[in-house]
A protein has these predicted regions:
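Alpha-helical membrane-targeting segments
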Residues: 1-24, 240-264, 336-366
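Conserved alpha-helical substructure of the radical SAM core
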Residues: 2-127, 220-224, 343, 366
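Short, intrinsically disordered, charge-biased short linear motifs at domain edges
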Residues: 20-30, 255-261, 311-321
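Generic structural signal for small/hydrophobic residues in well-ordered secondary structure
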Residues: 31, 35-36, 53, 112, ...
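Short cysteine clusters
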Residues: 35, 39-42, 77, 272, ...
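Secreted/processed peptides and extracellular or luminal domains of membrane proteins
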Residues: 41, 45-48, 278, 296, ...
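Radical SAM enzyme [4Fe-4S]-AdoMet core and its adjacent flexible, acidic
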Residues: 123-284, 288, 292-302, 343
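Flexible mid-to-C-terminal extensions adjoining Fe-S/redox cofactors in radical SAM and related proteins
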Residues: 269, 284-366
Length: 366
C-alpha cells in the first residue's frame, strides 16, 4: 500500500481534470455469471451471455500490462470456470498484480482446493486471498444460499485451503449481512471465528444492477445494520494485531464507519474513484466503472481487446461524469477501500488509530 501513496495526487487530478490519463489499480474481473448456488440476495445466475474465452482474457491482460495492483476474480462462481487456473496464470504473467483476490461459495471443494494450490504455485510474487462466502450457520446458511449441504461443503473447503502451507496464501470468510441474517449476526460471527480464518469481512446486501437485485428488499434496515457492525467493530478492537494485520484491521474499522455514514447521509462521504482507480470487466467483456451501476464504458470485443481504447474513450468519460459529480452513492467495499486510500484525511485517521492502539496496549502491559 505504501507504494500507492505517491500516486494519490495523480489520481485526484485524473478524476478532477481527466489528466494525467491513468489505468485502474484495482480491477475486478467477473469470469462468469454461472453459479451453482441460488442465493436469496443474488440473481446473477439468471444472466446469459457469451463469456470471454481464455484467449480473450489473455489478449485483454496483455493490453492492460503491469498497471493492476489489486485483482479480484468474481462471478457467479469463479470455480465453475474449468480454466480458472489458466486465467489466473495469464493475469499474473501479464499484469503482475500484488494481490489476487478470489471469492467462492466453497461447494466444489476438491476442485477449488486443487485449483487454489496451483494458482498459488503459479503466482509466487502475489498474495492470493481466497474468501469463503458464509452467511449463516448450518441449515440456515443452506437456506439463504439455496443449496442443501452448502454449509458443510464450505467448511470442508475452508479446512482444506487452510491446510495448504504457502506463505502467499490467505484464507478468509466473508459474510453478506442481509435482512435474512442480521438478527443472528453476533452468533454467526462468534461461530465462524472459532475456525480462526486469516480474515473475517462483511458487506451489506445491496441492490445491484450486476446481481439483478434492483427493487428487491434484501438489505437490513439501517438500525439493524448499524447494530451488527458496531458489535463487529467492538470485537475487532478487542483483538490484538501485529504488522500488516494491524494496518488491515485499522482500514477495515474505518470502512465500517464509512459504510454507516454513507447509508445514514445518503451521499458520497468520500469522493468516489470508481471508473478512475477501480473498474470491472464483465464476463462478456463490457468494462464498467462499478458493479452497482454496471454502465458500459465499451465492449472489449469490439475494441479488439485493447483496454486503453475503451478506458480512455468518450463513452468512458460519460460514465465517469455522474460519479465525479456525486450523483450516486453506495458502500460497495471494493470501491470504498480504494476511495479511502485516495483520502489523506482517512489515511491520517487510520495511522492515528493504530498509534493510539499501540499506546493503549503498551500502557496495559506496563
Amino acid at each position: 500500500m505504501i507504494q500507492l501513496i505517491p500516486k494519490i495526487t495523480a489520481y485526484q487530478m485524473f478524476r478532477q481534470f481527466g489528466f494525467p490519463r491513468l489505468y485502474p489499480l484495482n480491477l475486478t474481473v467477473s469470469v462468469t455469471y454461472r453459479c451453482n448456488a441460488r442465493c436469496r440476495t443474488c440473481n446473477v445466475y439468471q444472466k446469459k451471455v457469451r463469456e470471454f474465452s481464455l484467449e480473450e482474457f489473455e489478449k485483454t491482460f496483455e493490453s492492460l500490462g503491469s498497471h493492476v495492483f489489486w485483482l479480484t476474480l468474481s462471478g457467479g462462481e469463479p470455480f465453475l470456470r474449468k480454466d480458472i487456473v489458466d486465467i489466473c496464470r495469464s493475469a499474473y504473467q501479464n499484469c503482475r498484480p500484488k494481490i489476487i483476490n478470489i471469492a467462492t461459495n466453497g461447494i466444489l471443494s476438491d476442485f477449488i482446493t486443487e485449483s487454489v494450490e496451483r494458482i498459488v504455485q503459479n503466482s509466487p510474487k502475489s498474495l492470493i486471498i481466497v474468501n469463503l462466502s458464509v452467511d449463516e450457520i448450518g441449515e440456515k446458511h443452506d437456506d439463504i444460499r439455496g443449496v442443501k449441504g452448502n454449509y458443510k461443503k464450505a467448511l470442508k473447503t475452508f479446512r482444506a485451503l487452510n491446510s495448504l502451507n504457502y506463505s502467499n496464501l490467505t484464507v478468509g470468510i466473508h459474510t453478506v449481512i442481509s435482512r435474512f441474517n442480521v438478527h443472528n449476526f453476533p452468533r454467526i460471527f462468534e461461530e465462524l471465528n472459532r475456525f480462526q480464518p486469516d480474515s473475517y469481512i462483511t458487506e451489506i446486501a445491496e441492490q445491484r444492477v450486476e446481481l439483478g437485485t434492483m427493487g428487491e428488499e434484501i438489505a437490513p434496515s439501517l438500525q439493524e445494520y448499524v447494530k451488527a457492525i458496531d458489535f463487529l467493530c467492538e470485537r475487532i478492537k478487542h483483538r490484538r494485531y501485529n504488522g500488516i494485520s494491524a494496518l488491515t484491521q485499522a482500514f477495515r474499522l474505518q470502512y465500517y464507519d464509512l459504510a454507516k455514514e454513507i447509508l445514514k447521509e445518503k451521499r458520497q462521504v468520500l469522493p468516489c474513484y470508481a471508473g478512475f482507480i477501480s473498474a470491472q470487466i464483465a464476463p462478456d467483456g463490457q468494462i464498467w466503472a462499478c458493479c452497482i451501476r454496471a454502465e458500459s464504458m465499451g465492449d472489449l470485443r469490439k475494441a479488439g481487446y485493447d483496454f486503453k481504447r475503451v478506458w480512455f474513450s468518450e463513452k468512458a468519460q460519460a460514465v465517469r461524469k455522474p460519479i465525479r459529480e456525486k450523483k450516486c452513492f453506495c458502500p460497495l467495499a471494493n470501491a470504498s477501500y480504494t476511495n479511502m486510500l485516495l483520502s489523506f484525511r482517512t489515511l491520517a485517521s487510520v495511522l492515528k488509530n493504530i498509534a493510539a492502539r499501540r499506546v493503549k496496549e503498551h500502557m496495559t502491559r506496563a
